[in-house]
């Protein structure tokens, strides 16, 4: 019975065990009972005195002894109860604490179990949703295949009906009927003239009739085969014609959309008869194309007319018309990359390149309207560099000095960004900015070094000038583009590119100065930490690739005490707790790169001292 009623205390919470019981009230009742027992003293009544019939003196002494005994017993009993009560109170307190801890542990376990159950439910719900999506996809795919099968069946039925209704099939059916009549007459002749069955003349006639039937059957079969082949060929021709017409319509509609946006700018060339004629020709080509042309010939015609308008507008210095027609060329390159061949044949690339360079030299600043011209060259070179055979000739159409002009520090950051993208699009394993890396003369090498120096100065603009915050964000974004260019250049050109960049001392110095500046920004928390870390790591990687044994001397020859500042920044990146925490998963890589750079810049004793200081 006791075994059945036993329970596990650890499985219950404190609230369940003392449900309905007030322990404080029980403890107070026990204390009250002890105090009442200690205050009670046993005194004999008068009736008891009379029954004893003892002398008064004996009675008084006996009473005193009895009272003292009772008092001592009561006092002893009270002390025991107090002690026992204190023990019970302590046990109750310990039990309460243990039960409270057990309850908290049980609640935590229950909460953890609930969280685990919720996670499992979410996971199963997600899997269920994925399965539902897969089922819906399978159903849709099945319906699609079923529809295709039905269409194929209907097409086959239609083709069969067309073949049956063709004149050749009708003729074959008539010939089959004549053959049946001929065979019936032969059977009738057999039944009536059985005697003449084995005559030679009859056998000869039967043989000739059978030969005619076989020839007729073969001719019908070959006619049906020829009819099917001609029908398939006709269908294929119709489909190809429809496809060409659809391509032509698509090109025309796309160009019409672009042309409609720049028509107002192109109307400026209508002042003279030649310009008006060119404008009307282009307008007719786009809005009313000749349906007999295929898409390739149509695009070529549009390119020829557009190049004539571009040449005319640049001669007349009609800038808006030049920008509008260049937008049309951009649309053509996106619509049909093969149009780059037609564009090159019309000398559009050299025309735009020369126009840009002339305007830059004249005004010493490229207006924002010239973005569209740079975008065109960027798109064109990006497409043209896919064909390595023609790229050597294409680079001759773009002057190398144009690339450096587009990234001058005096320009707006957005314009410099377009220029950097233009340089990236001109980079191949053998070429960069219209310079042949494998066979460059002194003038080409000088222009290339000037280009890299100008691009390196972009990295240190923020360290030398006070720039407001919005514009500073544009420069930081521009730094990413510059770092991307040098990374792409090294990846494509390999060891040749590394050796070219290593001898460009301004580039090495600017990278070191940029590292110190970004390290300061990382500690100042003025910019998002992840952006500073990203650019700082990229700069350290780039410097590690381009570093040489004379790296320290290059920094010493620089201005603004770059050598000690650089060593401090690199040492902080290697050994500083704040920097390593900011680098996160890149901490090990940064430690390796920075310690390698420190070994080049300082002596072993100085490196040991730096490590000790940190």
Curated annotation (Swiss-Prot):
Intracellular or extracellular location(s): Nucleus
GO cellular component: ATR-ATRIP complex; chromosome, telomeric repeat region; nucleus
Residue spans of biased composition, Basic residues class: 191-207
Ranges annotated as biased composition (Low complexity): 29-43
Function: Involved in cell cycle arrest when DNA synthesis is inhibited by hydroxyurea, and in mitosis arrest after treatment with DNA-damaging agents. This protein is S phase-specific.
Subunit and partners: Interacts with cds1.
Protein name per its UniProtKB record: DNA repair protein rad26
Protein's organism: Schizosaccharomyces pombe (strain 972 / ATCC 24843) (Fission yeast)
């Amino acid at each position: 019975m006791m075994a059945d009623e036993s329970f596990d205390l650890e499985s219950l919470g404190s609230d369940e065990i003392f449900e309905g019981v007030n322990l404080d009230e029980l403890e107070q009742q026990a204390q009250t009972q002890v105090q009442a027992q200690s205050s009670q003293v046993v005194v004999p009544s008068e009736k008891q005195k009379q029954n004893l019939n003892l002398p008064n003196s004996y009675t008084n002494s006996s009473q005193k002894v009895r009272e003292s005994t009772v008092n001592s017993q009561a006092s002893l009993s009270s002390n025991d109860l107090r002690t026992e009560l204190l023990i019970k109170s302590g046990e109750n307190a310990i039990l309460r604490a243990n039960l409270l801890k057990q309850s908290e542990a049980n609640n935590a376990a229950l909460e953890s179990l609930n969280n685990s159950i919720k996670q499992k439910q979410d996971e199963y719900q997600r899997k269920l949703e994925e399965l539902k999506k897969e089922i819906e996809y399978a159903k849709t795919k099945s319906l699609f295949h079923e529809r295709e099968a039905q269409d194929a069946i209907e097409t086959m039925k239609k083709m069969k009906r067309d073949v049956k209704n063709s004149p050749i099939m009708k003729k074959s059916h008539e010939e089959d009927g004549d053959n049946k009549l001929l065979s019936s007459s032969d059977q009738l002749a057999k039944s009536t003239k059985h005697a003449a069955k084995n005559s030679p003349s009859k056998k000869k006639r039967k043989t000739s009739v059978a030969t005619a039937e076989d020839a007729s059957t073969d001719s019908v079969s070959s006619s049906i085969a020829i009819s099917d082949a001609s029908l398939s060929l006709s269908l294929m021709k119709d489909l190809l014609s429809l496809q060409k017409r659809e391509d032509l319509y698509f090109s025309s509609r796309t160009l019409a959309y672009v042309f409609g946006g720049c028509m107002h700018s192109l109307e400026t060339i209508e002042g003279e008869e030649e310009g008006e004629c060119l404008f009307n020709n282009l307008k007719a080509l786009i809005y009313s194309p000749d349906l007999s042309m295929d898409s390739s010939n149509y695009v070529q015609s549009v390119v020829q007319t557009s190049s004539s308008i571009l040449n005319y507008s640049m001669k007349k210095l009609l800038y808006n018309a030049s920008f509008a027609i260049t937008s049309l060329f951009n649309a053509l390159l996106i619509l049909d990359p093969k149009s780059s061949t037609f564009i090159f044949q019309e000398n559009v690339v050299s025309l735009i390149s020369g126009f840009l360079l002339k305007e830059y030299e004249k005004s010493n600043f490229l207006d924002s309207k010239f973005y569209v011209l740079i975008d065109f060259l960027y798109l064109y070179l990006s497409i043209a560099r896919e064909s390595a055979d023609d790229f050597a000739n294409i680079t001759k159409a773009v002057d190398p000095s144009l690339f450096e002009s587009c990234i001058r520090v005096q320009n707006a950051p957005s314009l410099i960004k377009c220029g950097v993208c233009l340089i990236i699009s001109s980079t191949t394993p053998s070429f960069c900015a219209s310079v042949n890396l494998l066979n460059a003369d002194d003038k080409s090498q000088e222009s290339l070094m000037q280009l890299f120096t100008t691009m390196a100065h972009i990295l240190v603009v923020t360290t030398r000038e006070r720039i407001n915050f919005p514009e500073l964000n544009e420069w930081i974004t521009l730094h990413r583009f510059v770092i991307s260019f040098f990374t792409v250049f090294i990846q494509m050109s390999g060891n040749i590119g590394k050796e070219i960049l290593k001898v460009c001392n301004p580039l090495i110095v600017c990278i070191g100065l940029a590292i110190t500046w970004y390290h300061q920004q990382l500690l100042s928390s003025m910019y998002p930490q992840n952006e500073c870390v990203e650019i700082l790591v990229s700069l350290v990687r780039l410097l590690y690739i381009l570093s040489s044994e004379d790296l320290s001397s290059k920094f010493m020859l620089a201005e603004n005490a770059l050598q000690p500042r650089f060593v401090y920044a690199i040492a902080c990146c290697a050994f500083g707790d704040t920097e390593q925490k900011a680098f996160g998963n890149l901490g090990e890589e940064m430690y390796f790169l920075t310690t390698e750079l420190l070994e080049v810049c300082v002596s072993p004793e100085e490196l040991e001292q730096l490590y000790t200081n940190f």
